[in-house]
Structures are given as structure tokens and as C-alpha cells.
Amino acid sequence: MLVVVGGAFVAEVADGAGGGRGWKRGWFGEAVAKGAPEILARLGEAGPADGDLAFGLNTAFMGDGAVIEVAEGAAIERPIHMVWMHGGAPASASFSRSLVSVGAKASLTLIESFEGPDDLDYQVNTALDLS
């Protein structure tokens, strides 16, 4: 499980330090800050969302997100669960971008959930780039 609260990764509740057998994970903001060429190249690619206003808004304001890579031929047995939590006041909006790369003949189950208190207004604009 990967947990993000208020836009910040919470390492204390994550499964595994950097992934598991056949897969690895990192954080989008960290990869961009380091200038990771494969991440920056994917940001510049045209995608099916060209002209999509919600995707454009996500691109303009995107914050952190997960970067998950599954090795060629790997079969990840346990689901990877990304939990995005909102809490506290005032009302908020979040814009995240996650990149998932799945190698040839590899498989995984990816679950995303978005949670927050019933009495808090929050808006989520998330984009998942799967390749």
C-alpha cells in the first residue's frame, strides 16, 4: 500500500521500501526534481487527452504521484493499492500525476482510492499514465 496524505507520501505505512519482487516504486515529484529523462520524456508525449480541459488543468497544477515500474515478465501477486487521503480544513483541491510502466508479459492489479472526511469539501484531479 502506498499512502499520500495532503499531497505528501507517508513512508511509515507503505509496504516495502521501494517496491517488491518484480516491481519498484518512486515518487513523481522526486523523479522530476532529479531530472529523470524517462519521466520528463513521458511528460512531453502527446496523449489521448490532448484537448481535454481536465487533463490540461492537471498538467498545469500537478503535484506528486507515484512512479511504478513492473519488470518484463513479472507477475505481481498482491495488488498495489494507492490511497490518496484528504483531511483537515479548509476545503482543498489536489492534482496528482502517476506513471505506471508494465513490462512485456507482466501483470499487476492496481487499486486507487480517494478518501476524506464526510464533512470536508475536496476536489481531486488525478491522471494515471499507463504504458
Language-model regions, residue ranges each:
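Glycine-rich and polybasic anion-binding loops at the starts of cofactor/ligand-binding domains
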Residues: M1-S131
